[in-house]
């Protein structure tokens, strides 16, 4: 599950991405959540306990792999993401590798 959407606007795509991931997790599926592109801003925002989507993030727990390292730096949210305990993913020349997830057998859904 890749979330590319920032929280600007209503944040509905971020919410749906988290809910769909949680649906898979509750069904016993191996689901991974990655925040990429502008979506790194969403992770920085929902990592804050005051955000209304924070509880969904906590329910997903270790299913959240983290955020694109390059994007986190570019969007100036690296410190918030790392400070909240999430990993920066940089396995493709500093960016997160979507190909790795495909090669590991995951179906990639984008929100």
Predicted segments — roles?
Residues 21, 31-37, 65-71:
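Short internal beta-strands
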Residues 1-15, 40-46:
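Short, glycine-rich nucleotide/cofactor-binding loops
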Residues 49-77:
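A glycine-rich helix N-cap at a beta->alpha junction
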Residues 43-50, 80:
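Glycine-rich loop at the start of a catalytic domain that most often binds anionic cofactors/ligands
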Residues 20-23, 57, 80, 100-101:
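Hydrophobic/aromatic ligand-binding patch that stacks against planar heteroaromatic rings
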Residues 1-3, 31-32, 64-66, 107-108:
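Structural motif
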Residues 79-111:
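C-terminal structural segments of small proteins and small subunits
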Residues 13-27:
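Histidine-anchored nucleotide/phosphate-binding helix
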